């Protein structure tokens, strides 16, 4: 799988109300990229059902499949915190994916 983008909304609909944009970059440890892709394919449908989740886009670099890029738009800071406390985040991300990473960077942005 090269790309994950599952959402019933268009991007323009998702950003209308503003919100908190989280951009993250992951790099898998050697030999772990396909395992991470599998974890993300199970995580994403559950994350997209969160009430405060406006948009999730998760991509895999074409020239380096060990790199993943995330664009996550939440209604507000409270929705982002609820996301991090969700059972699926704790299971798939904290429990399964993070130990397989060589590098993780994350930044938060307010939409203009």
Where in this protein do the model-derived segments appear?
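Short hydrophobic/aromatic segments of transmembrane alpha-helices and their interfaces
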Residues: 16, 37-38, 62-63, 72-74, ...
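Short, well-ordered beta-strand segments in beta-rich or mixed alpha/beta enzyme
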Residues: 20-27, 57-84
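Short amphipathic alpha-helical segments
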Residues: 32-55, 88-97
């Amino acid at each position: 799988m090269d790309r994950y983008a599952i959402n019933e909304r268009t991007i323009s609909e998702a950003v209308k109300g503003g919100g908190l944009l989280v951009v993250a970059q992951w790099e898998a440890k050697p030999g772990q990229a396909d395992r991470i892709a599998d974890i993300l394919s199970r995580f994403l449908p559950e994350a997209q059902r969160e009430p405060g989740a406006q948009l999730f886009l998760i991509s895999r670099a074409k020239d380096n499949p060990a790199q993943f890029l995330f664009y996550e738009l939440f209604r507000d800071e409270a929705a982002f915190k609820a996301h991090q406390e969700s059972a699926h985040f704790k299971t798939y991300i904290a429990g399964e994916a993070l130990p397989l990473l060589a590098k993780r960077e994350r930044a938060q942005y307010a939409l203009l």
